[in-house]
């Protein structure tokens, strides 16, 4: 592997978020609201990168410094025969961590196959425990029982330390914070609370809808005292805190209130092969022409694109007007 490339601010590229499908079986309001995204939304399957293309793309990213790959969507478990892609990616030398983010509804039937294929970690999105609220937040498409069954199946398949992500919106699900903590304390899984972010243009974001990590920390700490932990690695987005009684840990992702642009080492690629160097980007770069020329040519192209990267949207959110229409979260996996 050659030396890792760096962008204009000296940030290397270590982490690839790879969307394998743009479709989703949920219609969550903060990502893919039902009143803005039709039920039949999705690319023609011919527009999606094939497994051969995805493997070549990942090999090129690894050759320029990527060590962590996370498969996203949409809902990645909707992609047919996903375990076979995972098996191919697992065989790539240099990948230290291969993970997947899912809403969990299809996990029960696929957990064993995912584990056998070589997937190392799973993150499950779960914004409420209360069944009626969960159903409503999913656009009347999901049941919390399905997700909990999926988590149990993942445990049985050998995934012992899942991450559970909850996006907290004021007036929507902030009353679910303590019940979620109580449910996952002591299970070995890591619950992470994510500030509601202005990703895309269809989620109706306003600053008033944000419950900050500091506010969430105060609420949880009053019930279960917390102790701050060091980050596991440079660029880790979640601020880690352990329960003082030893019942595990909880994390806070504070992109709005405490931006972490300075340590961002991530690139995102959509299912149709467009590179986004920031979650809040308004323009992607089509990688398919370079991809068609093979892995070495794509690697050279990636170095060129990353070297001019200057994204730091969250740090300048309040002072610099946004230009262009931002990419939707469901295209690049959050």
Curated annotation (Swiss-Prot):
Entry binding sites for S-adenosyl-L-methionine: 30, 74, 125, 197
Biochemical pathway: Cofactor biosynthesis; molybdopterin biosynthesis
UniProt GO BP: Mo-molybdopterin cofactor biosynthetic process
Transmembrane parts of this sequence: none
Enzyme Commission numbers on file: 4.1.99.22
Keywords for this protein: 4Fe-4S, GTP-binding, Iron, Iron-sulfur, Lyase, Metal-binding, Molybdenum cofactor biosynthesis, Nucleotide-binding, S-adenosyl-L-methionine
GO molecular function (one): GTP binding
Binding site for [4Fe-4S] cluster 2: 261, 264, 278
Cofactors demanded by this protein: [4Fe-4S] cluster
Cofactor binding summary note: Binds 2 [4Fe-4S] clusters. Binds 1 [4Fe-4S] cluster coordinated with 3 cysteines and an exchangeable S-adenosyl-L-methionine and 1 [4Fe-4S] cluster coordinated with 3 cysteines and the GTP-derived substrate.
Signal peptide: none
Superkingdom field: Bacteria
Residues noted as binding [4Fe-4S] cluster 1 in the record, renumbered to the chain: 24, 28, 31
Residues of the Radical SAM core domain: 8-244
Reactions catalysed: GTP + AH2 + S-adenosyl-L-methionine = (8S)-3',8-cyclo-7,8-dihydroguanosine 5'-triphosphate + 5'-deoxyadenosine + L-methionine + A + H(+)
InterPro entries: Aldolase_TIM, Elp3/MiaA/NifB-like_rSAM, MoaA, MoaA_NifB_PqqE_Fe-S-bd_CS, MoaA_twitch, MoCo_biosynth_MoaA/MoaC, rSAM
Residues given in the record as GTP binding sites: 17, 70, 101, 163, 266-268
Family, similarity comment: Belongs to the radical SAM superfamily. MoaA family.
Subunit structure: Monomer and homodimer.
Role: Catalyzes the cyclization of GTP to (8S)-3',8-cyclo-7,8-dihydroguanosine 5'-triphosphate.
Protein name (Swiss-Prot/TrEMBL): GTP 3',8-cyclase
Record lineage: Bacteria, Pseudomonadati, Pseudomonadota, Gammaproteobacteria, Lysobacterales
């Amino acid at each position: 592997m050659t030396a890792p490339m760096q962008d204009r601010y000296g940030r290397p590229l270590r982490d690839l978020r790879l969307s394998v499908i743009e479709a989703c079986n949920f219609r969550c309001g903060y990502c893919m609201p039902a009143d803005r995204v039709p039920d039949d939304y999705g690319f023609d399957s011919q527009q999606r990168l094939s497994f051969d293309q995805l493997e070549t793309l990942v090999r090129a990213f690894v050759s320029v410094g990527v060590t962590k790959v996370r498969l996203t969507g949409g809902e990645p478990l909707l992609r047919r025969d996903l375990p076979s892609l995972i098996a191919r990616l697992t065989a790539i030398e240099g990948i230290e961590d291969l993970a997947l983010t899912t809403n969990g509804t299809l996990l029960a039937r696929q957990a064993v196959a995912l584990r056998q294929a070589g997937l190392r970690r799973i993150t499950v999105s779960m914004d409420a425990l209360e069944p009626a609220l969960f159903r409503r937040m999913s656009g009347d498409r999901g049941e919390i029982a399905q997700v909990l069954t999926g988590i149990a199946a993942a445990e049985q398949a050998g995934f012992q330390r899942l991450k559970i992500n909850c996006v907290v919106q004021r007036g929507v699900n902030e009353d679910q914070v303590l019940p979620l903590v109580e449910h996952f304390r002591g299970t070995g899984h890591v619950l992470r609370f994510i500030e509601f972010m202005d990703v895309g243009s269809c989620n109706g974001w306003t600053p008033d809808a944000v419950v900050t990590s500091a506010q969430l920390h105060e609420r949880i700490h009053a019930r279960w005292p917390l102790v701050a932990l060091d980050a596991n690695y440079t660029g880790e987005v979640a601020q880690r805190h352990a329960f003082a009684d030893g019942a595990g840990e909880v994390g806070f992702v504070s992109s709005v209130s405490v931006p972490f642009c300075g340590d961002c080492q991530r690139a995102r690629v959509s299912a149709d092969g467009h590179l986004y160097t920031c979650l809040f980007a308004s323009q992607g770069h089509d990688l398919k022409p370079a991809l068609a020329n093979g892995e070495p040519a794509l690697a050279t192209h990636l170095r060129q694109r990353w070297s001019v990267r200057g994204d730091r949207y969250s740090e300048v959110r309040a002072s610099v007007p946004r230009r262009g229409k931002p990419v939707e979260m469901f295209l690049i996996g959050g």
